[in-house]
Regions:
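Serine endopeptidase catalytic core focused on the charge-relay Asp
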Residues: 1-102, 106, 111-114, 121, ...
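Short active-site-adjacent structural elements
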Residues: 141-147
Length: 166
């Protein structure tokens, strides 16, 4: 039922949703869902307007955890560690600094600006600015001794490697 990206290096998959909705409706249950619209993909000029440090939000199911009673995923907040509009390490990627755990692979990472300002810094009360910036797929192994050893190519988001003790 899952369809995977043809490039094995790109950790994306999708499942046709229509059959699930039809099944729920046949059971006399109306499913609630929200979709990510194409209007949330930032244009090139929007990416150029961003700063290196931006607030980001990731929504997902780390280690399969979620609120089963209310059917709600986990929300993690952090910030960008590199500029989202500049290729990191020569790849069309950027790094984030946020709590990301094994099993978060495939979680969407959003730019979230809820400061009541538009991107031109004009005051707009009650208006949020949300854009999808990417999909989490890498993490670093952090040891209790305070060392970051290697970047793992599976799961989670990409963060800087630092070989220093705490």
């Amino acid at each position: 039922m899952w369809s995977f990206h043809p490039d094995r290096n790109i950790d994306l998959a999708f499942m046709p949703f229509k059959l699930i909705v039809e099944h729920c409706l046949a059971l006399n249950r109306r499913p609630f869902f929200t979709s990510i619209e194409s209007s949330t993909i930032p244009r090139d000029n929007e990416l150029k307007e961003l700063t290196t440090i931006e607030d980001v939000l990731m929504i997902g199911y780390p280690n399969g955890l979620w609120d089963e009673v209310n059917n709600i995923p986990f929300f993690m907040k952090g910030m960008t560690a590199t500029h989202p509009g500049i290729d990191y390490q020569g790849k069309q990627e950027f790094a984030v600094h946020m709590p990301i755990y094994k099993g978060s692979s495939g979680s969407p990472v959003f730019l979230l600006s809820a400061q009541f300002y538009d991107r031109a810094r004009s005051y707009v009360p009650g208006r949020d600015y949300v854009r999808i910036l990417g999909i989490a797929y890498k993490h670093f192994k952090y040891l209790a001794e305070g060392m970051v050893w290697v970047m793992l190519d599976t799961y989670c988001a990409c963060i800087f490697i630092s070989r220093s003790s705490v």
